[in-house]
């Protein structure tokens, strides 16, 4: 029979192949149900005598079959002498890089990525405080910036309250604020990240949305008590068009100074302008000998084992005598953004990152250290005392120390210094 088919003119042969394909399709589909899912098969016709044919799309057929009959359809077609190849059509997609890992059913622990918690000199040695049985209990914490996602699975939403302004309706602000809170108060539950001070009693947020930064700082401070900690996660463009710490502007300076005068410990980002804050251009506004807001100003230092010199100033960080201490300015694991874990929904409640950076990532580390110091001290420490202890008891800056950003806090040494001071005062 095959020989007879081969003797047919070529147009008739291809017509016969097409008819056979149609018959096979009809046989496969006669029991089809309207609501059954479909699968597309790709079938290539062959020469019945095995003669090699030139590649041509004219030899390809598309067969749509019910999903339940895929295996039988493939087997039947592959046995057919007129079929050279048959396979399930692949599902094609854009050749883009996935923005994050697949979302697991349960978020795993990411604390092994939080090197900033590690013993000094790599981190601030948060465990030195935790071993004393305290993780920030009794202290209130405020964060001043633009927005947050208090519904994130790793935040204590029942302890977070907005006291001023309207959150800025922009993903960048929400991601930033959520990442900041994760570093400080991320829940210690064996999943996701663990905040430096997860047992903080109350978390206050104050937004610059529909407000000024000075008003937001003032209202956040008004909600706090002596010994509580306020973090200012803001920067502004200075006279050279570079980012500056917000106390450069007099209204912000006054709001911060009023807060520290009441005993509130204020942590302030140095800013990402790569600028020398001791320049004469700034007219001594960032010279503590001329005026001192009482805030702890935080620069961005390089983390260990990342291709940079550990504890050296990162090039974007502002520097100068006004900068007191440093925190990790790169590779910080915390909440949101989604480059570490991304879940496909609009809530972003299970997003995590290990790439948070800038003086934005450095400042919450110091804020967490300050909370633990206040929580464990036998008496309320003044803002100036907290600043002095953190600056004196730390792992020293490396690299070009003339571009001063100060040491990385060492809580083990800082707590020992406080205990020694308490014993001397008895």
Residue ranges and their predicted role:
Residues 144, 153-155, 160, 306-360:
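Catalytic-core environment of secreted peptidases
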Residues 205-207, 329-406:
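Hydrolase catalytic cores
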Residues 47-67, 201:
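Surface-exposed aromatic
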Residues 1-53, 78, 82-99, 125:
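Autoinhibitory N-terminal propeptides
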Residues 50, 54-58, 78-140, 153-154:
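Protease zymogen maturation seam
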Residues 223-233, 295-297, 375-426:
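C-terminal subdomain of the subtilisin-like protease fold in secreted/lumenal serine endopeptidases
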Residues 117-121, 131-151, 160-192, 205-215, ...:
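Active-site-proximal loop motif in hydrolases
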Residues 5, 131, 135-137, 205-293, ...:
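Substrate-binding/access-modulating region of protease and related hydrolase catalytic domains
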